[in-house]
Design a protein with these regions (language model features):
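C-terminal structural segment of proteins
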Residues: 1-240
Length: 240
């Protein structure tokens, strides 16, 4: 179906067909969806990126899927469709229901993913046993939404399902507000970035497996979250 391989921008939202390959996200949507484009660059090999899709990641619902953290951080909405009952939309945070399970009904398919075009910097980090063609030991995405003074997060491969870290989001956004940093765009204090990382790690529910221990996953998440928040904030300051 040709429409599944198309994308469009309308009123500040990107409608990404479920069959758009990662390679096109990298080439065409790096400005509108920077976090997802970063994640797409880490997927498999060039051959896999030419064929693999966000729709495929959503359908398999693996907690280690690279697309999930940036979808969560950006506030994506999944558009699904049934021939008998029509279309409906599911927020990404409600889409993952268990290990490799999702909210799709038996007669539904994934039609598209709707994401707001980035209003601020986004970052994606991933730890694996090597630098390429690797399943994530843990992954993290961060999105700054300066237009509404909010922070988005996404955690991968460190819980039964991909998940956000709502307490960490509220903490960082609130501290930035209290310190006047949303307005001043001053330097992000290292202590604040570290406290954010600790809250992200606390939101995870990792296990020990052949790829890494639960303790390592928590530690790596705290480090990635601290770094991602700092990188994103520095990007925001440069754009001011």
């Amino acid at each position: 179906m040709a429409e599944l391989r198309e994308w469009a921008v309308d009123d500040g939202w990107v409608r990404l067909g479920a069959g758009v390959p990662y390679s096109r996200i990298i080439d065409d949507l790096g400005d509108s969806l920077p976090g997802l484009a970063m994640a797409a660059r880490t997927v498999g090999s060039p051959q896999i990126r030419i064929r693999g899709t966000v729709g495929g990641n959503l359908g398999s619902a693996s907690p280690a899927g690279d697309a999930h953290p940036p979808l969560l951080a950006a506030g994506a909405v999944i558009e699904v469709e049934s021939a008998a009952r029509g279309a409906r939309r599911i927020p990404a945070a409600e889409f993952y229901t268990g290990v490799k399970r999702n909210a799709l009904a038996a007669d539904e398919l994934i039609a598209a993913v709707l994401l707001p075009a980035a209003a601020g910097p986004q970052q994606f980090c991933k730890v694996g046993t090597r630098n390429a063609m690797v399943i994530a030991v843990s992954a993290f995405a961060c999105a700054l939404h300066p237009d509404r003074r909010a922070v988005g997060t996404g955690i991968g491969s460190a819980a039964p399902t991909p998940r956000r870290a709502p307490e960490a989001e509220e903490f960082l956004a609130g501290e930035l507000e209290s310190a006047g940093l949303w307005d001043s765009r001053g330097e992000l204090p290292d202590a604040l970035a570290r406290a954010f990382g600790e809250r992200v790690a606390a939101a995870a529910s990792p296990i020990d497996d052949v790829r890494g221990s639960a303790a390592y996953r928590r530690h790596s998440l705290s480090v990635m979250a601290r770094r991602a928040a700092t990188w994103a904030w520095n990007d925001l300051r440069k754009a001011a």
